[in-house]
Amino acid sequence: MAKAKKVGARRKASGAPAGARGGPAKANSNPFEVKVNRQKFQILGRKTRHDVGLPGVSRARALRKRTQTLLKEYKERDKSNVFRDKRFGEYNSNMSPEEKMMKRFALEQQRHHEKKSIYNLNEDEELTHYGQSLADIEKHNDIVDSDSDAEDRGTLSAELTAAHFGGGGGLLHKKTQQEGEEREKPKSRKELIEELIAKSKQEKRERQAQREDALELTEKLDQDWKEIQTLLSHKTPKSENRDKKEKPKPDAYDMMVRELGFEMKAQPSNRMKTEAELAKEEQEHLRKLEAERLRRMLGKDEDENVKKPKHMSADDLNDGFVLDKDDRRLLSYKDGKMNVEEDVQEEQSKEASDPESNEEEGDSSGGEDTEESDSPDSHLDLESNVESEEENEKPAKEQRQTPGKGLISGKERAGKATRDELPYTFAAPESYEELRSLLLGRSMEEQLLVVERIQKCNHPSLAEGNKAKLEKLFGFLLEYVGDLATDDPPDLTVIDKLVVHLYHLCQMFPESASDAIKFVLRDAMHEMEEMIETKGRAALPGLDVLIYLKITGLLFPTSDFWHPVVTPALVCLSQLLTKCPILSLQDVVKGLFVCCLFLEYVALSQRFIPELINFLLGILYIATPNKASQGSTLVHPFRALGKNSELLVVSAREDVATWQQSSLSLRWASRLRAPTSTEANHIRLSCLAVGLALLKRCVLMYGSLPSFHAIMGPLQALLTDHLADCSHPQELQELCQSTLTEMESQKQLCRPLTCEKSKPVPLKLFTPRLVKVLEFGRKQGSSKEEQERKRLIHKHKREFKGAVREIRKDNQFLARMQLSEIMERDAERKRKVKQLFNSLATQEGEWKALKRKKFKK
């Protein structure tokens, strides 16, 4: 048996784990949980790590770690209070528990002593008397020792002392007081009322006496004051008092309050009338004026429309009949003579002044209907009134001699004046001939008045077809302006005034106005193109087309990048400066006018116009002799040599001396007769002055361009070499010098490209360095810093990916925890609901069973 036991023991020893024999116990891993990272190539000498992994073990370890940290934070996310153990030495592992307790006790005693015993003076030492504490003796202060005899007197009462040592006087006094109290009996109600009445009467008498004393004192004071006032009758003047006592100045707040208090309140005004209402009122006003004019033209008087009084009957007391005045005069004397003649003269002067006052009253009464302060027809009415007054200022004798003749001639003259007067209402013209017939033969003011009244009588808000009528009127006015421009001499003042009406119509109907302008410009350009195709060249258009281009710049905005009217007008201007040759002085004047229009168009946008610079260069070229200006390059429409290459050269010294600088009139552009030689020379000098002024404006406008000096180079050469001499007038020389200074003052923003004078000598170089081409995908040799940098970048990238992976796993863990909480809550709720239904079912069953028992009974 013993042998068998020994064999079993040996077997157990051999089968025991390695840890029992001193070695560490190694857990047998599940082969299904082992993940082997297979390598594609076996490399000798390489130490492989992580070739075998245990994902289950690492996952369990990570789950346990998250449960201890992340889950704890998640559960305590809504808690704001935390228990902190601040006991001394709690987290110090070097101290033993006994040392911690001793140190804590010492700190507690020290804290207690610092707080409560800081102001006590030796209170820890208890004072004793015969072995007994003094505090206990103070508590038992009623105990009296036999030795303390001095305090016995203080314990006797006053009554006892008076009874024993006062000879009995105290007892007698006490007895007399008792007898006096017995004698005082309570009063009855009647006695109390009488006593109250007596007291009230006594108080009333006292108040009356006080009032009388006060009155006596006030009377006495008044008398004394009157006596003193007589002595103080002499007063100081007010000016001295003002000097002595200055009045305080009112504050800004007081002034503001007074201003607001005394400020006039706003009165309600009439509402603002609409444009349609204003147009209707204007039309009615013009109709009334036209009716008055027709009535005056026919010779009808206002008195004819007034009803005349009928025959007066005997019983008619108020039928328009006025009794005759009593012409008898009172007899009066002055210095002993009668005042008959003076009275007669005064009455005659009054009678002479009465008609004038009546006329003034009539004019003022009718002035409300005929008042037009801003329109020119008011001046015409004043002229007619002046004429009628002059006619009425004839001798009174002639009127007395032939009253019938004077009346007839006055009516005829009034009718003639009204016939010459303009009508107040006009129908819109249906054709250009109608408008021309209305305007021809009239002065400038009358023409403007006719156009204004046509617009007012045919306002679009008055009738349905008035819009189309006014749109036609714009085209008719354009055609009329062209006719005025083609006259010799052109009526430029009327054109200038008509532009205002064209502008108003353009603002009302912009589409029709733009169509009309484009039609006129298109017609002029087609005509010029046809002439170029047939004859090979085309002259500059007439003054009407130039004025149309001028009106275009006034009616429409010229600074837009693209405009349906202004852009074609700019193209038209550029074609005029490039395709029309300069053959005469009229062409020069027209070309300079086109240049002025160009500058007006681009004044705001500051666009560069090469045609403008080329034309000004040609003007300066034809103002210099051919020999002097050789070498300059010109383009069409100018020629370097030819008949008109010296068109603006002035050789007559007398004409140069008599020339005066002035503005160049447009009348020279449409003049049919040829000017004299002196006039022609003056025109040449004026054209040169205008060209220099335009060039100066171009210099100021284009000074900021990078290519400014390249553009102005030929012009500057002509000015410096040929035009700045003494052969021209002083004004032209000053203008030329100012233009040159402006050119030179502009900064050169860029340097032009130039060819190198000689080929540059190359520098001596060393042997070139050969660099091996690096193969992509391999780590090439580099410095230690570069290797360290790459290593850190690789490590940062790896750590970043690992952090993102861990954050993703944390989110998944929290999502699982939240889902488990939700499922637990749902299961708990389901369990409670099920329990509730079970209890209700049990209760229902018991109630039904009880009901069945009752039914059986």
From Swiss-Prot:
The cross-references to InterPro entries, in alphabetical order and at most eight, read:
Nop14
Task: Please indicate if the UniProt record lists rRNA processing as a keyword.
Answer: yes
* Biological process annotations from GO: endonucleolytic cleavage in 5'-ETS of tricistronic rRNA transcript (SSU-rRNA, 5.8S rRNA, LSU-rRNA); endonucleolytic cleavage in ITS1 to separate SSU-rRNA from 5.8S rRNA and LSU-rRNA from tricistronic rRNA transcript (SSU-rRNA, 5.8S rRNA, LSU-rRNA); endonucleolytic cleavage to generate mature 5'-end of SSU-rRNA from (SSU-rRNA, 5.8S rRNA, LSU-rRNA); maturation of SSU-rRNA; maturation of SSU-rRNA from tricistronic rRNA transcript (SSU-rRNA, 5.8S rRNA, LSU-rRNA); ribosomal small subunit biogenesis; rRNA processing
Could you tell me where the Basic residues compositional bias lies?
1-13
Any keyword Nucleus?
Answer: yes
Where Phosphoserine occurs, residue numbers? S96, S146, S148, S349
> What cellular-component terms does GO give this entry?
90S preribosome; membrane; Noc4p-Nop14p complex; nucleolus; nucleoplasm; small-subunit processome
Its localization reads:
Nucleus, Nucleolus
Give positions of region: Disordered: 1-34, 162-252, 264-422
The subunit field of the Swiss-Prot or TrEMBL record says: Component of the ribosomal small subunit (SSU) processome.
Which family is this protein grouped under?
Belongs to the NOP14 family.
Q: What is this protein called?
A: Nucleolar protein 14
Q: Which organism is it from?
A: Homo sapiens (Human)
